[in-house]
């Protein structure tokens, strides 16, 4: 928890000192830099909201039963929260921001630390990170929707199946 807190606070400090130049130089890297900072600030607020709401139940007008200490109620608590449209939308934005921030952070790490040096290597690493972000967004969104709708984003026909039960016959007696 402490490394995440350090990363978050340090990221907010860096973001407050950063000068955005997307108006002057609208290159993809400048936009990516902007979105990395924007998602970081959003995630700082979102994670604070998430912890207050889900762990402690301290957000007025929402869940008042904390999940901490109530593991047997956790599914019902989350399902009730995600049934509220704006909460679901907020969490989907949270999943999108997390997926982008993590995937682009991997790419920045690989470039800054000299793991991918050449222009082509950086381009393909970026493609891989974008694919990772899309995959994480899909999995995370499906998980969130699954609390409200069985099967999540998948059609019911894909996840509902009939289980054949075999009738156990009694053993033959001699």
Task: Cite the ranges covered by each PLM segment.
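Membrane-embedded alpha-helical bundles that constitute the cytochrome b-like, heme-associated redox core
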Residues: 1-174
